[in-house]
């Protein structure tokens, strides 16, 4: 057994002194004081820090199979554990794509061999993510895939998305969508606005995202499908999702830390560490995202952790791949910028990473109580640390946040009662 002493948990927004007794994989007792005298008990000193439920990230890219030069299941899940995550859901833009039962089984085998945290894989919506032929939803659902998505690309035709939603309803699984109309991208590498004009870099307009969301929420209404929108980035998208929810359509949405923290004006020049998809938008868009998150239009935060090799990101923005890493920096950045400055409560932030994503996808994770799995993370809210690439457990360090000084760093993460990350002393 394990006993975590000298910790604090959030109860109705208030930090309470807490000890947690763990028996095997599950929590046996949570109390302000636990008297356990057995010599078999391993004591973990939380040192007065927060004990939070293990975080749930419904949007990561682990790159394996096919992209192991960028990231592997092992390195990506080590990075997740360092960031406090105990459950991650990897996107299907791998090679091969998890679009058949055989490919999903091969992926699960890899996961079972090297994953450091719980991994719930998505299956693709269309074969090879080519947008022309649906996967076998029934067989893949029976195989236990988390949900269906073609993330990395948008489903370009309404007829294909309509057919996919009807199949998803039959198997009672969500459709998760990267919303991007290819006919409106115009070869863009950042947001289309004043800053892109100043830099002479082609831009992607807001409507490339929002028109596809508008299309899809109507299809979701017609089919009754649970439709989840990935990485919302524009004010128009927030408005469409808000209106859809008011109309009773089953739509949920996520937002990334970088879209909450940065705008097009933060792009210093031709620096591919500021290139992600969707791109960093205007400050007006960022404010709409913050408002949407706080009023419940946007349901949760997801990292869209997207690692790339150094040589790939060393290219100009017009040639480099989209994406930044985020698993190891998400919570500290948001805690530092929003909670410490009094804009959010600590309870709100923890919920965005735990119970909110778990609830919208009907996952029995993201909470701490008697008999639940001992999935948790201990977080130091008071010590300032600098984000350094040499500290990353990910294979990649493509992020604009290197050098930022942050609070709220996880010091230990536990999955089913086993320590999967512990800060070096």
UniProtKB/Swiss-Prot annotation:
GO terms for molecular function: allantoinase activity; dihydroorotase activity; zinc ion binding. PROSITE patterns: DIHYDROOROTASE_1 (PS00482), DIHYDROOROTASE_2 (PS00483). It comes from the Bacteria. The active site is at 304. SUPFAM superfamilies: Composite domain of metallo-dependent hydrolases, Metallo-dependent hydrolases. Its cofactor is Zn(2+). The keyword Zinc applies. This is Dihydroorotase. It comes from Staphylococcus epidermidis (strain ATCC 12228 / FDA PCI 1200). The lineage of its organism: Bacteria, Bacillati, Bacillota, Bacilli, Bacillales.
């Amino acid at each position: 057994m394990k006993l975590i002493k000298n910790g604090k948990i959030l109860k109705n927004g208030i930090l309470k002194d807490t000890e947690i007794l763990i028996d095997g994989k599950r929590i046996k007792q949570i109390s302000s004081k636990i008297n356990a005298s057995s010599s078999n008990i391993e004591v973990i000193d939380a040192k007065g820090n927060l004990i939070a439920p293990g975080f749930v990230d419904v949007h990561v890219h682990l790159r394996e199979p096919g992209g192991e030069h960028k990231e592997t299941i092992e390195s990506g899940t080590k990075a997740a554990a360092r960031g406090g995550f105990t459950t991650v859901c990897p996107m299907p833009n791998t090679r091969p794509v998890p679009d058949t039962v055989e490919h999903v089984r091969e992926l699960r085998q890899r996961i079972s061999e090297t994953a450091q945290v719980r991994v719930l894989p998505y299956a693709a919506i269309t074969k090879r993510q080519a947008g022309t032929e649906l996967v076998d939803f029934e067989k893949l659902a029976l195989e236990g895939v988390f949900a269906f998505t073609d993330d990395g690309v948008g489903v370009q035709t309404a007829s294909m998305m309509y057919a996919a939603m009807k199949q998803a309803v039959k198997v009672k699984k969500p459709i998760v969508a990267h919303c991007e109309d290819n006919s409106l991208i115009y070869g863009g590498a950042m947001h289309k606005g004043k800053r892109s004009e100043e830099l002479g870099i082609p831009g992607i307009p807001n409507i490339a995202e929002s028109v596809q969301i508008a299309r899809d929420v109507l299809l979701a209404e017609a089919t009754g499908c649970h439709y989840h929108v990935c990485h919302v980035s524009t004010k128009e998208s927030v408005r469409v999702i808000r209106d859809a929810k008011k109309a009773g359509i089953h739509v949920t949405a996520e937002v990334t830390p970088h879209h909450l923290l940065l705008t097009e004006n933060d792009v210093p020049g031709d620096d591919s560490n500021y290139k992600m998809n969707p791109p960093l938008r205007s400050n007006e868009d960022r404010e709409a995202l913050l408002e949407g998150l706080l009023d419940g239009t946007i349901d949760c935060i997801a990292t869209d952790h997207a690692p790339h090799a150094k040589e790939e990101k060393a290219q100009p923005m017009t040639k480099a791949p989209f994406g930044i890493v985020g698993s190891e920096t998400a919570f500290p950045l948001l805690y530092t910028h929003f909670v410490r400055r009094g804009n959010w409560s600590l309870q709100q932030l923890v919920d965005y990473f735990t119970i909110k994503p778990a609830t919208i996808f009907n996952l029995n994770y993201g909470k701490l109580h008697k008999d639940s799995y001992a999935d948790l993370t201990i977080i130091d809210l008071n010590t300032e640390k600098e984000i350094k690439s040499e500290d990353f457990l990910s294979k990649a360090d493509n992020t604009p946040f290197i050098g930022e000084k942050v609070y709220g760093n996880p010091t230990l993460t536990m999955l089913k009662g086993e320590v999967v990350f512990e800060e070096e002393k």
